[in-house]
Amino acid sequence: MGSEKDSESPRSTSLHAAAPDPKCRSGGRRRRLTLHSVFSASARGRRARAKPQAEPPPPAAQPPPAPAPAAAQGPPPEALPAEPAAEAEAEAAAAAAEPGFDDEEAAEGGGPGAEEVECPLCLVRLPPERAPRLLSCPHRSCRDCLRHYLRLEISESRVPISCPECSERLNPHDIRLLLADPPLMHKYEEFMLRRYLASDPDCRWCPAPDCGYAVIAYGCASCPKLTCEREGCQTEFCYHCKQIWHPNQTCDMARQQRAQTLRVRTKHTSGLSYGQESGPADDIKPCPRCSAYIIKMNDGSCNHMTCAVCGCEFCWLCMKEISDLHYLSPSGCTFWGKKPWSRKKKILWQLGTLIGAPVGISLIAGIAIPAMVIGIPVYVGRKIHSRYEGRKTSKHKRNLAITGGVTLSVIASPVIAAVSVGIGVPIMLAYVYGVVPISLCRGGGCGVSTANGKGVKIEFDEDDGPITVADAWRALKNPSIGESSIEGLTSVLSTSGSPTDGLSVMQGPYSETASFAALSGGTLSGGILSSGKGKYSRLEVQADVQKEIFPKDTASLGAISDNASTRAMAGSIISSYNPQDRECNNMEIQVDIEAKPSHYQLVSGSSTEDSLHVHAQMAENEEEGSGGGGSEEDPPCRHQSCEQKDCLASKPWDISLAQPESIRSDLESSDAQSDDVPDITSDECGSPRSHTAACPSTPRAQGAPSPSAHMNLSALAEGQTVLKPEGGEARV
């Protein structure tokens, strides 16, 4: 008994504590990891780091201390782990202060046994230290994939850069740490600045090719002259057209002048050309805000475009900035497709909407009212049931909540339906009968116009599409033939003064040429073919005109067999279309005429002197014919309205075309076979009109048909034009 009491006494307890068992761990409960212990350990670590700095270190030769009592030999239980915890905390703080994502343990806060992370880009499971955290979103990817992604986005000017997994924009600080490339980062910042400036409507970029300076000009519309303030540039440009300053000219005039200059440079530069082999240029259009060129496949895909430079959202069909309701409005633009609706389709859609709107709105209201009255209570009951389903609540409480919610929704649903229909129906009617007609007529889509005060006129003609880069290239590619050139050639090939004038125009087999077929009795009116004694003045002309580039006009004259052939320059035909390019036009014409009257000439004007000269030639030919008539009998006349001696068809005649004085020397040198044909100068050789035949006609021959003279004019692929007769051929 006494020994048991002594062992249980406090004195015996102190003796046992003074000699602890080395196999037992003291303070095991205090090593348990809890949230409080983590924060308390960090506080103890900070105190432990501050304590050695305050106390001086003990001397090295200090004698060992005297033996203390057993109760004071052991250190406190919490003093042993405090030193390692302080060292770990100091290392973590130093690692967190280092720039970059090189030490992921500091950012992760875990050891090497942390869970691996799967990269969403390369689908490879990696340790957490290779998947840095981002400031903008919680998504993580491997460092190599992020660097490659950032380089690709910056090189293609897709800024600002978003997260690969979501639409959150990456922080520039993260981009700088991931790239570690100052030149690429400078390019990123420049693209960001350009995108911001492009969204400013008053920002104007200097048009100088070696300048990237921008001028923000607020309120400069009235004084459009701007000056680049960059040192060494000082370029003056226009605020409106954003091009080089054009004094004493409007923007349209300056634009036309630049187009002509570009056209001339294109003709004389072999490297600048466009053809079908260069690609479909119809797919290139400028952004309506920043004018950056955008290419899109013409496959009928989505027409909602977003500019990568300024972020402008526009429609590819109408090239206008749009909103979310653009494709639901009566603009004629469709979300998919290659072209907008035609004017006829838009008008029919408008009429159908105006007529069918009351029926459609009534059906919508009739369906919406019962759907809301029945659907709202059902929806409320299901939501309340799903909310109480996962909770541990009594069944009576849940049923009471569901019943109360459904009852209130049954009472409120008719009111909600009535308010919705009462507000929605007037809005729909106002949209159909107000917004739709006004928007269509304001944009010219309805085709309603006033016909000179005679009433309202509805036009169903198709609208012209927007002018694209391809249209400009086509204009530069084929500047010689067009609608205006056809009109000019029509006025050139036909002359007035004959009741049988006529001209028909048809498209040739080549896209770069235009074929003109003319059937006219007055084309050479006033000439020998419609003279007083000649009843034949029918002339068929078929010409192919092609633009050629030569340094100067050339022509030659020759004769083959009995027919007279003329090689002449007809650049004036094309000059009537484009007088500025007269020196670069060349057209070779070969003429053969079936009837062969002698010493008759086709002159290029209808002046009185030329007419008198032709009369003198006719008189000389008649005298020669009367003097030598005994030797050879003239063929009988086929006309009933003329006499045998006066009929021109019964006598041989020679015809020559008068040439300009500028090429008379060439003609005289090549006229060895046509010495009997006299030369005649033309006063109108430099005019843009074509050379027509002119000679006086007698009253008896006016308006007579001319079936015996045929002239066919055909064009070679190389640009030469050959005129072939039915009876022979002459080369020009």
UniProtKB/Swiss-Prot annotation:
Zn(2+) 3 binds at residues 238, 241, 246, 251. It comes from the Eukaryota. Residues 54-79 have a biased composition (Pro residues). This is E3 ubiquitin-protein ligase RNF19B. The lineage of its organism: Eukaryota, Metazoa, Chordata, Craniata, Vertebrata. GO terms for cellular component: cytolytic granule; cytoplasm; cytosol; endoplasmic reticulum; endoplasmic reticulum membrane; ubiquitin ligase complex. Residues 1-318 are annotated as: Required for ubiquitin ligase activity and for protection against staurosporin-induced cell death. It is found in: Cytoplasmic granule membrane; Endoplasmic reticulum membrane. Zn(2+) 2 binds at residues 206, 211, 228, 233. It catalyses: [E2 ubiquitin-conjugating enzyme]-S-ubiquitinyl-L-cysteine + [acceptor protein]-L-lysine = [E2 ubiquitin-conjugating enzyme]-L-cysteine + [acceptor protein]-N(6)-ubiquitinyl-L-lysine. Residues 1-112, 618-732 are annotated as: Disordered. Induction: In natural killer cells, by IFNB1/IFN-beta and IL2/interleukin-2 (at protein level). Up-regulated by endoplasmic reticulum (ER) stress triggered by thapsigargin or tunicamycin. Residues 673-682 have a biased composition (Acidic residues).
